[in-house]
Each structure stands twice: as C-alpha cells, then as structure tokens.
Amino acid sequence: MLLDAGPQFPALGVGTFARHHHHHHHHHAAVAAAAAAAAEMQERELSLAQNTFVEPTHMAAFKLNPGGGSGGGSGGGGGGGGAGPNGGAGASGPHDLSPPGQTSAFTSQAGYPTSALAPHSAYSGAAAFNSPRDFLFRGRGFAEGSAAAGGGQHGLFGPPAGSLHHHPHHHHQLSHAEHPQGHLLFPGIHDQHAAASQNTLGGQMRLGLPGEVFGRTEQYRQVSSPRGDPYTAAQLHNQYSPMNMGMNMAAHHHHHHHHHPGAFFRYMRQPCIKQELICKWIDPEQLNNPKKSCTKTFSTMHELVTHVSVEHVGGPEQSNHICFWEECPREGKPFKAKYKLVNHIRVHTGEKPFPCPFPGCGKVFARSENLKIHKRTHTGEKPFQCEFEGCDRRFANSSDRKKHMHVHTSDKPYLCKMCDKSYTHPSSLRKHMKVHESSPQGSESSPAASSGYESSTPPGLVSPNSETQNPNLSPAAAAVSAVHNVSSGASGALASNFNEWYV
C-alpha cells in the first residue's frame, strides 16, 4: 500500500514519504517507515502546518524525497551508491541523513546536498529526521558537533566549512555552482568566527518571526538594546554633548570579515570620544596680576563638579558664597545661600543633572524647578489660574500668568525704545520690533533714524560726502544718503541689538 502525505501539507512543500521500491528486499522496510512517518505527521504535525510562526517561504526550502534513496542497497558501499531520481545520495553516501536501509527523508529543494543541512556528514547518520518537526525544531541536531565542522556553525544560514566546497561531485546539483553563496536560505546571517561556533543554536529555532535573529550566540546576549533607557540616554547625551553616543546602524555585509559580529554590529555602541573638561576657577588669594585659573582637566562631568564643590566652593564653614569662575558676569557679587551658588556654577560647567523622565523627550535641565515646570507640558497640568474675575485662563507657571494679567489692567510695561509705543506682553513687543527692522525707507519720518537705528544698507558703503561728490544725485537719493549719515554718526551712542533689550 502506498501512502502519500503530500496533499495533507501543501504549505510545507511535503511530497510523498516513500515509494514502492524496485528492489524486493527493501519493500517491507520502506512501507513500514512510510507508515510510521505518515502516522506521526497526522498526529503531531497538523498544527505545524497551520502555525502562523512558520512561513511558507521558509518551509518551501525543504521537501521530502519521493525516491531519493533507491540506489542505497544495490549500488551502495564505499563510494556512496547510486543516486535517486531527484538527486538524493545513496544510503551509504556521505550526504545521506538516514541510516542504511531507510529511505532518505529530506533533500533540499534547491538541490543542496543533504550534508549542507547538518553540521557535518559524520553526524548525519545518527540524526535521522523522520518528520519536518524533528528536522526543523531539533536544535540539538544542528548544534552538536559544530566544532568538528571546521567553524561552520549554521548550515541553514550559510554553507559551513566542509559542507559545499569539499564535495566537487555534487556541484552539478546547484543551479549556480559558481556562486553557491547565492543559495543561502537566510543571507542576512554571515559566517562568524570558529571560536563562537560551540555556542550556536543551543535552543529551539523560531522561523518566520520578523526581527528575530536565527542562531543567536551566547557571546552577544549581553549586548544592550539600542532602545535604551531614555532617562540615562538623555542625561549622557546632554551632559557630554561632544561625546558620540550614537549607534552605528550600518551592518557590514562583507562575507570575508569573519571577525565582525555581523547582524549584531548595529546593536553595539561605538566608543565615546574622549573630552577634557577644564576648571577655570580663580583662587582669590593669588597675588599674581593677572590671576591664573585652576586649569585642572577632567574626563567626566562628575569629576569636574566634585572638584569644584570640594576644592573651591567649600563646605558649611564658608560664609561668603561668591563665584570666582573666570569671566563670570557677576563680578564677585555674593549669593545669599550656598545652594544658589551651586546652581549658578552649572552655568559655567554646563552640568544639567535633571533630565526629563518622559520617553522620547530628551531634554535636561540645570535646576529641578525648571524640570518641574517642563513636565507640565507632558502632563497638561496648569495650576496657576488667572485671578481676574470672570477669566478662566490657566497657566503652567506663575510668570506666564503674570504676563497675562496685564491684559486685564491698563499696564503696558513693555516699551519700545525706537518709538513711543508700549505693550502688555513681551511677545507683542517683539512683533513690533520687526516692523522697525524691516522698514528702512520709513525711517525718514520715524524716530528710528535719529535714534541710531541702522538701516538695511551698511553705513560704511555710503560716502559721507556723497551729496557733493555726485551733483547728479536726485533729491530722494540725497535724503536717503543723509539718513545714513545721521545713522552712522549716532550708532555708537545707542545699541541696535534688540535682543539685548528684551528677553
């Protein structure tokens, strides 16, 4: 009786398990093996065929050999026997997965010799796979003996040493014998160094999971994920801005670079660029003139902050809380408390020890109060309500509420220094200042020309005697030239940088 299990599992690409052998002395053994395999497939493998984790594209790479081992009995012995109709080797050949007298269960659909699907041919006889479940999910069968294969750690993902290249009589089975690597079942996984081969495929294989890496080796399990803690990542990136905390997302695809971790390279952090942080604190007891700063260098922000706090700021015995950092704009003006001095020094050192804990934000702050206010942008909290009766406006901080209160009163404390206009909110004043910046010709009648406002044409490009030098100058051009002369003469008395006036 012939049993054909192929129609039961079309997604697996499963063909018939066995055929009636032409040799009479193999008939009973073949029928018994086929019956056992069919029963096992019917009972255990029906769920595998419907499993969503096993993609047909992966399973189509394997099929059962309908008659691959027919030459094992008659021509077997020594050289490997005769080949079957589909190119399967004989039972005694070096590429047979089955023991003598049993039909070879699997062959590669692309014409691979069966030894390419196992670590080495010596183990193939002991690892007979009678069902796709045994073949696909027996991780042990692919891991044991990998060291003896000469570094070929995964036959499923690339041709291991001794599987394709040292059997020239099977190269005719490959559709592209010149480039056997073109037939890699999983070309994204490259061959790795032989030292890592003993840790390969130690557990169950998973097929068809996007993003999963097959054959994950032990030495890369401790590599941190690129999706690290945003709290720590933001703190490191902003505290040490010159440092390269990015990750190399380009995988190396050279087949000859065996020392690279291959697919794991994109998850490895690059070494940080070393930087030097210099202490510019000036000792007030120095007798030198000009006084020299400390100039000690540190490799981390923590070391610099500790040095300044211990060596220069001092402990509670210090009564004067003065910043002596080089070129400090306070010019020796003391603080009322030590914590205020510590917060001020962060302006010089660049320390920002308070990162936003919300994922994806990445902002860091030098003061905890600023972080508290910033977190309200994520939570939507607005605890400051307008105190004017009938107004329901709420704000995240008190300063915004104070600016809003001028809308309800007649106060307009934000004055324009170019004209006599005033505004209730600084944003309105900033919009107004753009009018002065963008209207150079209107400056003839505006106070901007006489108060030192610089027009769009640089005064240096206009000659002071342009009226007398060019008698053909039109009256309008002469008026514009006169405006430029007045503007250039008074520019030293009044600054023109509006950003310095209004913050």
Swiss-Prot record:
Tissues expressing this chain: Expressed in both animal and vegetal regions of the oocyte. At blastula and gastrula stages (stages 9 to 10.5), expressed throughout the ectoderm. During late gastrula to neurula stages, expression gradually diminishes in the midline region of the neural plate and increases in the anterior neural folds, and continues to be expressed in the posterior medial part of the neural plate. In early tailbud stages (stages 22-23), expressed in the dorsal forebrain, midbrain and hindbrain. Subsequently expressed in the telencephalon and diencephalon/mesencephalon boundary.
Residue spans of biased composition, Polar residues class: 100-112, 463-473
Sequence segments annotated as region (Disordered): 61-112, 146-175, 427-476
Inducing factors: By zic1, zic2, zic3 and zic5.
Annotated compartments: Nucleus; Cytoplasm
Bias kind Low complexity: ranges: 438-456
Protein keywords: Activator, Cytoplasm, Developmental protein, Differentiation, DNA-binding, Gastrulation, Metal-binding, Neurogenesis, Nucleus, Repeat, Repressor, Transcription, Transcription regulation, Zinc, Zinc-finger
Domain notes: The C2H2-type 3, 4 and 5 zinc finger domains are necessary for transcription activation.
Function: Transcriptional repressor that inhibits neurogenesis and induces neural and neural crest differentiation. Regulates anteroposterior patterning in early development by inhibiting expression of the nodal genes through the inhibition of vegt. Required for gastrulation movements and for proper anterior neural and axial development. May also act as a transcriptional activator. May bind to the minimal GLI-consensus sequence 5'-TGGGTGGTC-3'.
Protein name: Zinc finger protein ZIC 2-A
Organism: Xenopus laevis (African clawed frog)
Organism ancestry: Eukaryota, Metazoa, Chordata, Craniata, Vertebrata
